[in-house]
């Protein structure tokens, strides 16, 4: 706004100056001399005096538009993408304004130059008009008046143009000012907004101050509470440790009498149980002996029945095997007859097809033989023709050789004097010239005769020159005729070649047509054969399907027989297993009896030991009762201390709860502020996510496009490989047919029951019944031992888990302390590392600086020695060294080169900045090349224009003009 006000003030001052100038012009129009002087001063075109701001020097980041956009973006009214678009548009507009300003400045300079030229021309005209200054006539007065009125008219026109220009600029400024004025809010609204903002800021400031004070107070309270809590926690931990120790002692002492009583009860129970077991075992022994007798009787009966059943099963099995063999043989015979029938039918069909094919092949071979005989006759005729041509060419060759020999003889017969004629002619010319000179130099001749002689000499020279030119023309014409003859011969040869090619091509076309007919016939035959083979294939496939169905039925029957066999075997195994189980039961009963006897003896020994232990336990019980009384008194004291500690703990919990409530209230207030911040962050994140989604969509679409293009390329590449793929398909079909034949052969081998490789027996020996029983007993004993070990491990695990739980509680209590210590240690280690790194860096810098100082000291010493030597030489009157002179010359040369380089850079920069195109526009782009240098050795490397389609070189002549011989370009002699 300040710039705009300055701009308007300057314009008003310019307008006042112009009005004063106009008044002065009107006042001085009374006299003719004054008008003429004014006309000389006033230019014909007045340049508009508008104070245009220099846009090139403006910083875009500090413009009001950019500042306004940044404010809107920070306030959240404008998104980032929209801001970037508006900034880009503004920069484009700014660039256009700068370019228009530059063009305007150039136009103004041109206008100034033209006005100066017009003024000079007017001065010259006036001087020409004022030529007769002495004489003053009516014509001169009228001319002066006319000039005055013309000048006034031009001044009025200029003023009108100037005012119109000023008016347009002012209207534009007015529109801009109005737009800005509309954007500017009203003072009342601004005051209201400012008041509201001030009030809100004051309220927020007060609230912030209050909150800060409250936070400070709360922090102080929290610090004090934390200190108290730390003290109380330490006291509580000490008391808890003491309490845990006491509890452990109490538990340890309490568990001793309880364990003793439990052990006594266990022993009494065991005693009673063993007595009961003895009674039960005796009763079971009697029952087992009775059952053993019954089982023995049953076993004998079952053994007899088993023998009978085994005999019956073996007889039936032999019968079944015989029947199965007969059935299998019959099936084989049936299958063989069917196979023979099918093979004979297939052979008959194949023989029919082969017979037809042989007939067709015979016909084809006959046709080929007739065709080849015709070709042979044609070739024989061609051979005769070529032999005739060869004879003619040989005769022509002999004639040409004779002619050549005759010409050579004639050449030898020509005298050598004819060859020396040009030299003799030159010598005669020289003698004539000498005679002419001598004649001209003779004094006895008169002037007229001398002139005649000179004229004749000049005419003679002219005639000689014409003769030489004519001779050269004749020689050139001879050469041209020779070249034309050669071209004619070449064209005739080319014509003959093309005729021969034409004939050959016609012959090839005919032969190709015949081949095409033959291939078509073959194709028809192949199609016919394929149809026949297809019929055969269908018949074979139907037969194969029948055989497959029969095979399936046979498989079903075999499976049924196998199932029956399995059922019978299972029944046999069930009977065997029942017999084995009964034998095992008997053995187990015997083992139990022997175990019971041993257990009874061991129990008697245990009873004796328990009585001895009971006496010892009674003595221990009395000693432990005394210790129990002492521990009970200690427990009462500890319980009283525990009650006091619980009261202290409850007080500390109340304090903690109060401070927690206060902290929650403050946290809620802080959360409100954080929520506001989070809302803004979420909005920003949402927009970023949308942008990211759009970018991903674009990337995905690009990938799709690339994939489609790749697929297109792949399909385009696969098109030319079609023939090779068809060939591969044929090979694969052949392999498929071979595989099908192999599968049929394998199926036949699998169906055949007499095949040796059909069954595979498992190696090794089968165990006997006794070995199996022993193995089972061993496994049972191992299982019992493992169960005992597992029980022992479970008991140990329970005791260890109790101890570990106690240790775990203690370790969890000490975890926080160790964590804090570890954190402190880590922080201290980090600090130490940082300090060491800084120390190392400083040491490295110091060493570098020391090395630099040493180098500089060396340089200083060298310079001092050099200066000392120079001063000593100057004192002695000796000249300086040549090396110094060379160095000085190098310095001067470097300065000159640097100055030249800077001047060239500035010139290039000016050229690039102010490069003018033919249409008057300035550009910084490099000029496009309009010509190229041809890569030829014969001609000079002169630039040639590109032509209509730059930057492409003109193309060579097409294929239809290749038979024409290119003219040989003569090299330019410089």
From Swiss-Prot:
Positions of modified residues (Phosphoserine): 12
Gene Ontology biological process: cell morphogenesis; cell population proliferation; cilium organization; flagellated sperm motility; gene expression; manchette assembly; nucleus organization; single fertilization
Stretches for region Disordered: 1-44
Biological source species: Rattus norvegicus (Rat)
Residue ranges with Acidic residues bias: 10-21
Subunit and partners: Interacts with CCDC38 and CCDC42. Interacts with intraflagellar transport proteins IFT20 and IFT88.
PANTHER family: CILIA AND FLAGELLA-ASSOCIATED PROTEIN 58-RELATED, COILED-COIL DOMAIN-CONTAINING PROTEIN 146
GO molecular function, one term: protein-containing complex binding
Coiled-coil region(s): 105-160, 195-340, 421-474, 512-660, 687-712, 767-848
Localisation per UniProt entry: Cytoplasm, Cytoskeleton, Microtubule organizing center, Centrosome, Centriole; Cell projection, Cilium, Flagellum; Cytoplasm, Cytoskeleton, Flagellum axoneme; Cytoplasm, Cytoskeleton, Cilium basal body
Protein name (Swiss-Prot/TrEMBL): Coiled-coil domain-containing protein 146
Metal-binding recorded as keyword: no
Main subcellular location: cytoplasm
Secretion signal span: none
A cellular component term, taken from the record's GO annotations: sperm flagellum
Protein keywords: Cell projection, Cilium, Coiled coil, Cytoplasm, Cytoskeleton, Differentiation, Flagellum, Phosphoprotein, Spermatogenesis
Known function: Essential for sperm flagellum biogenesis and male fertility.
